[in-house]
Structures are given as structure tokens and as C-alpha cells.
Amino acid sequence: EIYDRMVMDGHVHTPVASLAPDVFCVSMNGLSKSHRIAGFRVGWMVLSGPKHHVKGYIEGLNMLSNMRLCSNVLAQQVVQTSLGGHQSVDELLLPGGRIYEQRNFIYNAIQDIPGLSAVKPKAGLYIFPKIDRNMYRIDDDEQFVLNFLKQEKVLLVHGRGFNWQEPDHFRIVYLPRVDELAQIQEK
């Protein structure tokens, strides 16, 4: 649920656990995406649904949480304050907002490149373009992104890194500002 606050274009996030309340579900969330503090590993998990058949699992979680592997207490205290009140991410996801405009820019840039296509993201910080392999002879998406990194100094992630079966996709993070994304488009 880490992208639950990162939805755009009037879409609403639906928690997975709400789709089947009669099924035990472990949901995890945190601040790293919605508050744009990547690497700030503070988060939580919610156990929902019937728990009678997962008592051993819950006991294991409790045991783990009570071991010497304690959380960063100060960081955990930030969570409640961060989730209440004004949420600056909301403004970034509306028309005119930085993330919204960056998403639109990279989506349109991809559509303008012959042989590339993408579905416009409804949430998150990434776009997953598809490469027309009839136009571009790419048989190894990992080698493609490594070559692109070496030649153009732009970091992409190969699609098979996300369990995509065919070597015809890659991931772009659209967090850089539009002027930086425009430089990437030229490459």
C-alpha cells in the first residue's frame, strides 16, 4: 500500500484488504514514497481479516518485533504527525503539480518516440514503456539498460527485473524535474 497516497486524475486507491475482508491479509505501508523520503525506512504493517488460522504467524511477528531488532523509535514517532494535517503530496499530484506534470511529460515523450508505447500511470512514480521489438532488435533488456547507462548516463531498470517475461519493457522513474526529463528524451 506504499503508493496509496500517490494516485492522480481523480482515481482512488483501494486497499487490497478491503477486496476480501474474509481473507487474512498483511498490508504494509510507509512514508518513503508519499513523503518523498526515499531510503527513510519507517513503516508499519496491518493484519486484517480472520486471524484464527494464523496465530503462529502472528506469534512469530510479535517475537521478531520484541527482539533486539528494534525499530528506530524517533523515526516511528514521526509517523503519526506525518499522516495528519496538511499533506503536501496532494498538491504535487494535481494538474500543475510537479509530479503530475513530470508524469505527463514523460508519458507524452514516450508516445512521441517511434517504437515505444506506454500506459499512462494512474499512481506512483514510475512508467513502464514497451519496446516494439520489430522496430528495435532488443533480445536482452538487461543489456539494453546497461548499454544505455554506459552510453547516455541515464539509469533505467530492465523489465524482467520486475518479473516481466519478455525483454520488451523498461522502467523510468519520473521524479527528475521536467527540464531533466527533456534532456533524457533527447537521448
Residue ranges and their predicted role:
Residues 137-139, 147-156, 162-187:
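PLP-dependent enzyme catalytic core of the Aspartate aminotransferase-like
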Residues 76, 80, 96-110, 118-132, ...:
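Conserved glycine-rich beta-strand-loop-beta hairpin in the small C-terminal domain of fold type I
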Residues 1-15:
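Conserved PLP phosphate-binding loop immediately N-terminal to the Schiff-base lysine helix
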Residues 48, 84, 130-132, 175-177:
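Residue-level recognition of strand-loop junctions within catalytic nucleotide-signaling folds
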Residues 18-97, 107-109:
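Conserved core segment of the aminotransferase class I/II
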Residues 25, 116, 154:
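Short, conserved active-site loop motifs that form the nucleotide-linked donor/cofactor pocket
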